[in-house]
């Protein structure tokens, strides 16, 4: 019959954080090796796609790595993907353009009203 292994930590339950892998040591003994949970890639806050250029780590491990592993040198780097940043910049530009156009149209209508009043007198 195969050799049995037991958990090496205090938690006796088969939970997601207490997974083990049975490993044979050089001495021929089977031991339980605790397996860490897999890390997920950081996602874009707008579209949900995986962010490129950012390390895939467990949340606590981000505290131990340098800033270059956590960001990219761009606006919203490490938070939004390049396509979403491009979209935001274009949208902001178009909104500003629309404000300027609205202001110019308003000034033109006011000037037209003033000229009508002068021509009536």
Curated annotation (Swiss-Prot):
Disulfide bridge map: none
Tagged with keyword Protein biosynthesis: no
GO terms of molecular function: structural constituent of ribosome
Localization annotation: Cytoplasm
Task of the protein: Component of the ribosome, a large ribonucleoprotein complex responsible for the synthesis of proteins in the cell. The small ribosomal subunit (SSU) binds messenger RNAs (mRNAs) and translates the encoded message by selecting cognate aminoacyl-transfer RNA (tRNA) molecules. The large subunit (LSU) contains the ribosomal catalytic site termed the peptidyl transferase center (PTC), which catalyzes the formation of peptide bonds, thereby polymerizing the amino acids delivered by tRNAs into a polypeptide chain.
Any further remark recorded for this protein: Present with 21000 molecules/cell in log phase SD medium.
Family: Belongs to the eukaryotic ribosomal protein eL34 family.
Protein name: Large ribosomal subunit protein eL34B
Species annotation: Saccharomyces cerevisiae (strain ATCC 204508 / S288c)
Protein encoded by which gene: RPL34B
């Amino acid at each position: 019959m195969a050799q049995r292994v037991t958990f090496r930590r205090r938690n006796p339950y088969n939970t997601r954080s207490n997974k083990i892998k049975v490993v044979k040591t050089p001495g021929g003994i089977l031991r339980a090796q605790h397996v860490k949970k897999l890390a997920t890639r950081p996602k874009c806050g707008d579209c949900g796609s995986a962010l490129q250029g950012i390390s895939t780590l467990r949340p606590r491990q981000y505290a131990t790595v340098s800033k270059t592993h956590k960001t990219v040198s761009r606006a919203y780097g490490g938070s939004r993907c390049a396509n979403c940043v491009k979209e935001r910049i274009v949208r902001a530009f178009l909104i500003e353009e629309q404000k300027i156009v609205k202001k110019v149209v308003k000034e033109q209508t006011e000037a037209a009203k003033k000229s009508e009043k002068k021509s009536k007198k």
